[in-house]
Amino acid sequence: MATLQAIKYSRGKLLVLDQLRLPHEHHYDEVSTAEQAFDCIRSMRVRGAPAIAIVAALAHAVELHNGDCTATTPEDTIAYIESRLDYLKDSRPTAVDLSNAIALLKQAARAATVEGLAHPEAKEAILNAYIAAAETILAKDLDNNTSIGTHGAAWLQQQYHATPSRPLSVLTHCNTGSLATSGHGTALGIIRSLHQQQLLKHAYCTETRPYNQGSRLTAFELVFEGIPATLVTDSMAAALFALHRERMNIGAVVVGADRVVRNGDTANKIGTYALAVLARHHGVKFVVAAPTTSIDLETESGAGIEIEERKPEELTQVTGAVVNADGSVDASRTARVAIADQRIGVWNPAFDVTPHDLIDAIVTERGAVVKGADGRFDFSQVLPERWRW
């Protein structure tokens, strides 16, 4: 079955699906400069930690391929690349995939510097190395997501002895599918894998206020792929667990991550922490799905994570397609409406931090990580190349 694509890329051209227009309109923006990528990311036309990193990396690759770098020496070429990447790094501060990708891309450009080459050849080698590294980030993300889905489905199957005759139901939050990645998704990828193996009874997705990524995007993906699913508001999760956990065999809350730090504390879309508390109270497993690029071993705990705050209007206003008097949706017309007194004070953090003690497993492309006897997550098995005491 065809899946949605948030990112379409060929060398020299990048198209990014404008997710603010979903689910009623499919429109791709051409992104050919760092400035356009910054605006695309900042305005949340593209979102999801992996997708943000991919768009930033590829937008600069398009710039370089199309000749925007006028530097003549290797040193100036690298300085130009690094300045553009530093600019893109500020587009959204909480997701660690972006900063990890930028570090990798800088390293690739520096490593391409070859002694003895004339300046034009040296510059070309640096540009080619950057473009190849950016394209590798795109290709690896899809492979990683498929592996996350496989490992996550296997872990849940083992926990609950799920079978096609006794499948699991799960709840997910925000959007972590093809629209947040290069394809398949992280947490939603686990749901896809369960569904493909006939181990999924039902998926529940939260509305995910205030930006409604669950109702606008995840619900759209689930319907698009024919996965049995129900949309609930964020505040219905407790009632869902209390009233339907046993009948629907609700076994897990599966979420993505914008940043997982060394002790396992996880920054994710606002509302994730509340779901973790509810899951623990009701005996439901709480699972984080994230590629190893989302793991930040330099930050010891969630206290060190910078939490982005968004503008008040995202909480007090909504935009959507116009509903006609007969109940039909006119996708050609949109309207922005106020849903609160515009004079009210607003606190609008984009993310919260779920403490590691509320998390049962962190599923990566290299396997599921669970806490040891000391109650701590140990990422040394999935990140031996980056782990150090």
Curated annotation (Swiss-Prot):
GO BP, sorted A to Z: L-methionine salvage from methylthioadenosine
Residues the UniProt record annotates as site (Transition state stabilizer): 174
One Pfam family hit: IF-2B
Keyword Transcription regulation among record annotations: no
Reactions accelerated catalytically: 5-(methylsulfanyl)-alpha-D-ribose 1-phosphate = 5-(methylsulfanyl)-D-ribulose 1-phosphate
Highest taxon above the source species: Eukaryota
Subcellular locations according to the entry: Cytoplasm; Nucleus
Enzyme type, top EC level: isomerase
GO cellular component, one term: nucleus
Signal peptide (UniProt feature, chain positions): none
Gene3D superfamilies per UniProt: translation initiation factor eif-2b, domain 1 (1.20.120.420), Translation initiation factor eif-2b, domain 2 (3.40.50.10470)
Annotated EC: 5.3.1.23
Keywords, comma-separated and alphabetical: Amino-acid biosynthesis, Cytoplasm, Isomerase, Methionine biosynthesis, Nucleus
Enzyme active site: 258 (proton donor)
InterPro entries (alphabetical): IF-2B-related, IF-M1Pi, IF_2B-like_C, Initiation_fac_2B_a/b/d, M1Pi_N, NagB/RpiA_transferase-like
Protein family membership: Belongs to the eIF-2B alpha/beta/delta subunits family. MtnA subfamily.
Reported function: Catalyzes the interconversion of methylthioribose-1-phosphate (MTR-1-P) into methylthioribulose-1-phosphate (MTRu-1-P).
NCBIfam families in alphabetical order: eIF-2B_rel (TIGR00524), PRK05720.1 (NF004326), salvage_mtnA (TIGR00512)
Protein name: Methylthioribose-1-phosphate isomerase
Source species: Chaetomium globosum (strain ATCC 6205 / CBS 148.51 / DSM 1962 / NBRC 6347 / NRRL 1970) (Soil fungus)
